[in-house]
C-alpha cells in the first residue's frame, strides 16, 4: 500500500512540476517587441505612427493599426490629441527616444 501511495505522490508531484515549468517557458519567451505609452499630439494619425514605428517594414501597416486599435479598445481608427495609446515597438528602436511624449 505504501508503494502505491508513493507512486501516486510522485506522479502528482511530477505533473505539477511539469505544469509549472510549462508556464515559465510560455511566459518567458523572447518577445522582440516592447510596448510604450504615448500621448497623441495634434495632427497624429495611426497611419503616421505606423510609418514612424515601422521604418524597417517588419510589420504590415494595417497589422500595426489593427493591433493598436484592438489593444487600446478604440472604437475606430480616429485618435484625438491627449489620447494615451500603447504601441508596440522593437527593442532599441530610435522611435522610443524620439518621442517627447513617451509616457
UniProtKB/Swiss-Prot annotation:
Presence of keyword Cell cycle: yes
Keywords: Cell cycle, Cell division, Cytoplasm, DNA damage, DNA repair, Septation, SOS response
Record keyword Cell cycle present: yes
SUPFAM superfamilies: LysM domain (SSF54106)
GO-annotated biological processes: division septum assembly; DNA repair; negative regulation of cell division; SOS response
Database matches in Gene3D superfamilies: LysM domain
Pfam families in the record: LysM
GO CC annotation, single: cytoplasm
InterPro entries, per database record: Cell_div_suppressor_YneA (IPR022887), LysM_dom (IPR018392), LysM_dom_sf (IPR036779)
Subcellular location: Cytoplasm
LysM domain: residues covered: 36-87
NCBIfam families named in the record: PRK14125.1
UniProt family annotation: Belongs to the YneA family.
Function (record text): Inhibits cell division during the SOS response. Affects a later stage of the cell division protein assembly, after the assembly of the Z ring, by probably suppressing recruitment of FtsL and/or DivIC to the division machinery.
Protein name, entry field: Cell division suppressor protein YneA
Amino acid at each position: 500500500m505504501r508503494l502505491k501511495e508513493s507512486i501516486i505522490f510522485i506522479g502528482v508531484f511530477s505533473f505539477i512540476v511539469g505544469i509549472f515549468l510549462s508556464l515559465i517557458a510560455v511566459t518567458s519567451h523572447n518577445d522582440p517587441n516592447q510596448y510604450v505609452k504615448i500621448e497623441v499630439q495634434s495632427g497624429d494619425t495611426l497611419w503616421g505612427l505606423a510609418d514612424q514605428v515601422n521604418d524597417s517594414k517588419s510589420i504590415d501597416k494595417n497589422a500595426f493599426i489593427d493591433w493598436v486599435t484592438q489593444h487600446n479598445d478604440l472604437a475606430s481608427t480616429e485618435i484625438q490629441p491627449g489620447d494615451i495609446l500603447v504601441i508596440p515597438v522593437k527593442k532599441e528602436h530610435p522611435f522610443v527616444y524620439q518621442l517627447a511624449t513617451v509616457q
